[in-house]
């Protein structure tokens, strides 16, 4: 009868077009949960009475099942709260639409991973490890590919980076290794079972990479209130701008013309801002080193593909070339000395040498392994080796082992000189043919963080470079002003012996001291006469002295008079200071003539010192 009354009430509500309230829904759900809980308790009590309860399945199966059950419960609670929000207000419908869009995007991403980036579905796609590596690389290029300014990331890009990286890295939650362990049941029985735990390399390196990721995002987020701004290179700076004067001096970014130019106030950065920038640069440098260490470790643990070994030449000489091979096989070998002799003017040349050295390492290793394989082969078909042949093979193996060690040392020193060297051909082939998904995740994630950290360091270096130019331009503007130049040109302000030429002549304290550079480095043409002064007294001294002097005296005078010719635009030579200098030069000429007459029988040009 009660059920009939309830059904009639429901029919009346439907007729009156009334929807059930939220309280009714909650009471009905509570009643259902209480009835289901009571039935579950009754069934569990009967099972407990019959036999001793086994441990829960999450305890037996190990870490992933436990984590998955936790995720399931958390997702159910989130979905329930989300449904409650959608029933209360209209803003929940927008959130529901965004959630569905995220789900569709996640489906698309995982579909590409499963298909191996082959949308035809014909099975011609890449392996899963390479697909995940490409997904992380493409996501990094999308978010950080245009990191041209030191400014915080937009909220959309930051949310997209974290959300999609969480999707991709969720694969690593199910990469486990089985370890033997003992399980104790409540009745006291012990059983040896295999439990799951996360793989050791992922358990150690993946949380570290996530921490480095958050630190880099925090560094970018700290550039909110800054003392600098950016201007595109295509925009002409105004004349009133204090930093427009040194804009054309920035040659650091000529190769990368698309980068905006950092601009500063006329006084440059303050000491506090510059100290903070240096601190952030140091933090980014440490993050870069940590990411590079994880990346190199992941690449080292990858197997060398057979396709790379098949393309190697037969001997090490053809890999290294005659010059490097001669140095490596010599008795006295030094990697630093060899690198000093080589042309390492660009990173392209350094990368080519690194590829050659790396190829020679695996060529010599393969030769050693093949020789050892011949010695260890004891089949009846192969001829028996004599003791002399065995000794020759062992000596050849020792020699190739020494060459492998030298090549590894050379490669290590080369990478230390070029820490930002790009990946070698061996690294590229390892990434392409790798099958291990965990190593692929570590390698691609660390490489993405390497790129982000190096970009931040480069932008900070550009900013510090512009700050140095700003402060130098202020000093140059002070020296090049008309008032200062008129003061410098005045003859009573700056004496002649202490004046420095603007053409870059080496500095000297006075004319009575030894020159700052050796006269033997200068080789003027024979018979050349230089008349730097226009006064008659100077011409008479030169005409009398030059024809009868030797080669060494001419070099000394050219050294001094050459500098005086450059300084004549600043000082009037008719002054008393000029006459004193000319008299001093004439005395030096007479002394040199006397010395030249006493040293006629010397071989080669004599060496002179001016007193």
Swiss-Prot record:
<feature type="compositionally biased region" description="Low complexity">
    <location>
        <begin position="34"/>
        <end position="51"/>
    </location>
</feature>
<dbReference type="Pfam" id="PF03759">
    <property type="entry name" value="PRONE"/>
</dbReference>
<comment type="function">
    <text>Guanine-nucleotide exchange factor (GEF) that acts as an activator of Rop (Rho of plants) GTPases by promoting the exchange of GDP for GTP.</text>
</comment>
<feature type="region of interest" description="Disordered">
    <location>
        <begin position="513"/>
        <end position="541"/>
    </location>
</feature>
<feature type="region of interest" description="Disordered">
    <location>
        <begin position="1"/>
        <end position="62"/>
    </location>
</feature>
<keyword id="KW-0344">Guanine-nucleotide releasing factor</keyword>
<protein>
    <recommendedName>
        <fullName>Rop guanine nucleotide exchange factor 5</fullName>
    </recommendedName>
</protein>
<dbReference type="InterPro" id="IPR038937">
    <property type="entry name" value="RopGEF"/>
</dbReference>
<dbReference type="GO" id="GO:0005085">
    <property type="term" value="F:guanyl-nucleotide exchange factor activity"/>
</dbReference>
<feature type="domain" description="PRONE">
    <location>
        <begin position="93"/>
        <end position="477"/>
    </location>
</feature>
<feature type="region of interest" description="Disordered">
    <location>
        <begin position="588"/>
        <end position="611"/>
    </location>
</feature>
<feature type="compositionally biased region" description="Basic and acidic residues">
    <location>
        <begin position="525"/>
        <end position="541"/>
    </location>
</feature>
<dbReference type="InterPro" id="IPR005512">
    <property type="entry name" value="PRONE_dom"/>
</dbReference>
């Amino acid at each position: 009868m009660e059920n009939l009354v309830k059904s009639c009430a429901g029919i009346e509500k439907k007729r009156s077009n009334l929807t059930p309230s939220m309280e009714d829904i909650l009471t009905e759900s509570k009643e259902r949960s209480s009835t289901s809980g009571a039935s579950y308790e009754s069934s569990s009590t009967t099972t407990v009475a019959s036999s001793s309860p086994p441990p829960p399945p999450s305890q037996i199966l190990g870490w992933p099942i436990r984590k998955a059950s936790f995720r399931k419960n958390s997702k159910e609670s989130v979905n329930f709260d989300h449904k409650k929000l959608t029933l209360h207000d209209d803003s929940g419908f927008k959130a529901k639409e965004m959630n569905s869009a995220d789900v569709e995007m996640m489906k698309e991403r995982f579909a590409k991973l499963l298909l191996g980036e082959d949308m035809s579905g014909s099975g011609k796609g890449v392996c899963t490890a390479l697909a995940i590596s490409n997904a992380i690389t493409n996501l990094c290029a999308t978010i950080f590919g245009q990191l041209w300014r030191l400014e915080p990331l937009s909220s959309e890009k930051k949310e997209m980076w974290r959300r999609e990286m969480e999707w991709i890295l969720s694969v690593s939650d199910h990469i486990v290794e089985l370890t033997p362990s003992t399980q104790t049941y409540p009745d006291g029985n012990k059983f040896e079972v295999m439990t799951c735990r996360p793989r050791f390399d992922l358990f150690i390196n993946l949380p570290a990479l996530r921490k480095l990721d958050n630190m880099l995002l925090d560094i970018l987020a700290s550039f909110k209130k800054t003392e600098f701004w950016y201007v595109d290179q295509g925009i002409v700076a105004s004349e009133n701008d204090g930093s427009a004067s040194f804009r054309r001096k920035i040659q650091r970014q000529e190769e990368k013309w698309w980068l905006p130019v950092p601009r500063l106030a006329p006084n440059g950065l303050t000491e506090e801002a510059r100290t903070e920038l240096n601190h952030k640069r140091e933090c980014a440098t440490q993050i870069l080193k940590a990411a590079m260490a994880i990346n190199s470790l992941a690449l080292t643990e990858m197997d060398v593909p057979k396709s790379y070994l098949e393309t190697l030449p037969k001997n090490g000489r053809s890999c290294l070339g005659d010059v490097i091979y001669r140095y490596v096989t010599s008795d006295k070998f030094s990697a630093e000395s060899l690198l000093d002799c080589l042309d390492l003017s660009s990173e392209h040349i350094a990368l080519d040498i690194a590829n050659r050295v790396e190829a020679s390492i695996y060529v010599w290793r393969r030769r050693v392994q093949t020789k050892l394989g011949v010695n260890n082969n004891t089949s009846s078909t192969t001829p028996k080796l004599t003791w002399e042949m065995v000794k020759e093979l062992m000596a050849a193996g020792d020699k190739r082992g020494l060459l492998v060690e030298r090549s590894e040392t050379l490669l290590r020193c080369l990478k230390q000189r070029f820490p930002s060297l790009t990946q070698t051909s061996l690294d590229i082939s390892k990434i392409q043919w790798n099958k291990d998904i965990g190593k692929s995740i570590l390698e691609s994630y660390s490489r993405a963080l390497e790129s982000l950290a190096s970009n931040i360091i480069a932008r900070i270096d550009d900013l510090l470079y512009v700050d140095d130019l700003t402060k130098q331009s202020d000093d140059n503007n002070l020296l090049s002003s008309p008032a200062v130049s008129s003061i410098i040109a005045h003859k009573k302000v700056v004496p002649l012996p202490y004046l420095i030429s603007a053409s870059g002549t080496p500095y000297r304290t006075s004319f009575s001291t030894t020159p700052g550079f050796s006269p033997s480095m200068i080789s003027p043409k024979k018979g050349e006469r230089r008349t730097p002064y226009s006064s008659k007294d100077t011409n008479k001294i030169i005409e009398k002295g030059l024809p009868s002097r030797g080669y060494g005296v001419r070099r000394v005078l050219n050294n001094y008079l050459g500098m005086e010719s450059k300084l004549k635009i600043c000082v009037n030579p008719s002054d008393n200071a000029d006459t004193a200098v000319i008299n001093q030069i004439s005395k030096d000429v007479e002394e040199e003539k006397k010395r030249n007459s006493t040293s006629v029988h010397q071989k080669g040009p004599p060496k002179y010192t001016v007193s």
